[in-house]
Amino acid sequence: MAASVKPTRRYESPRRREQAAATRAAILEAAQGLFESQGYAVTTMSAIAHAAGVSLKTVYVVFETKSGVLRALWHLLLRGDDADVPVDQRTWYHQVLAEPDPERQLRLNARNSRIVKQRAAALMRVIRDAAPSDADLAALWARIQSDFHANQREIVASLHERGALTPGLDVERGADVLWALNHPDLWHLLVGQRGWSPEDYERWFGDTACSQLLVTPHSGER
């Protein structure tokens, strides 16, 4: 009987992994600048490669498509790092759900919203604007909206379980309210167009969420 041949294991040195990570980061940084300054449709893979200082082939090898670049960039900005951990498994999200005080819970949610939007709000508009003409991005935008609503619903459900929701407000309507207050379009209107500071937005979001959702808003953290 012929001896079985074990497949050769591919060895990647730490240095090579570091170089690959640096190349990926350079491409994403270049793509972010181009997408946010001139939009998705105008930005080409060649332009991304040139801005990143890499070959066009490298961009295709790493991300395959332009929508793949945008999708990877979105996940990076949403999560704040390259770790493949969904939002609903992030420590900061679980801290919101675990917060026992209803008002502090909503204000912590507002703070996290401000932090994420400072990183990712501009790219959200790029994705939204490109979605009608690109099936991949249409699916990404739909998923963003769905996940966003589901996360806010989970927060409202936790308030409902503790009897903290204002009378007459059920979980579904409360989730819609919190989702609307937390929507990136409102950030764009208030911060982008009206010139509110991110801190003003966070305070308004927290105040409004408490007044709309909670049975008895407290003094809270101002």
Language-model features and meaning:
Residues A26, A30, L34-G68, A72:
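Helix-turn-helix
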Residues M45, W74-D81:
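Short, basic, alpha-helical segments at the C-terminal edge of helix-turn-helix-like DNA-binding modules
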Residues V62, A72-L73, I155, W204:
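Residues in the recognition helix of alpha-helical DNA-binding motifs
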Residues M1-A22, P217-R222:
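N-terminal intrinsically disordered/low-complexity leader segments
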Residues H160-T208, G220-R222:
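Hydrophobic/aromatic-rich alpha-helical bundle segments in the mid-to-C-terminal region
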